[in-house]
Amino acid sequence: MSLNAEQKAKVVLEHGSSAHDTGSTEVQVALLTLRINDLQKHFLEHKKDHHSRRGLLRMVSQRRKLLDYLKKRNISKYTDLIQSLGLRK
């Protein structure tokens, strides 16, 4: 259910400015999106797992806050990130 180091490194290289750029907003949003997608697959099988659902809602909220921050700071990076991750506005 959690991401392994290879998956994280791939996301950091794809969305970050360098291989060690784990703190940028774009990388954080991309990592949260991967974790959210993994949890959505988990809920297809475990519909009554309410404890994990709370964590999912927390991650979605955190991603929304980061996206709002990015939208205020740099609209072009925001639109590029939304398109590359396949998210709605």
Curated annotation (Swiss-Prot):
Pfam families the record matches: Ribosomal_S15
Transmembrane portions of the chain: none
UniProt cross-references to CDD domains, sorted A to Z: Ribosomal_S15p_S13e (cd00353)
InterPro entries membership: Ribosomal_uS15 (IPR000589), Ribosomal_uS15_bac-type (IPR005290), uS15_NS1_RNA-bd_sf (IPR009068)
S-S pairs: none
Family note: Belongs to the universal ribosomal protein uS15 family.
Protein's UniProt name: Small ribosomal subunit protein uS15
Complex formation: Part of the 30S ribosomal subunit. Forms a bridge to the 50S subunit in the 70S ribosome, contacting the 23S rRNA.
GO biological process assignments: translation
Keyword entries, A-Z: Ribonucleoprotein, Ribosomal protein, RNA-binding, rRNA-binding
Species in which this protein is naturally found: Hamiltonella defensa subsp. Acyrthosiphon pisum (strain 5AT)
GO (cellular component) term, any one: cytosolic small ribosomal subunit
GO terms for MF: rRNA binding; structural constituent of ribosome
PROSITE patterns xref list: RIBOSOMAL_S15
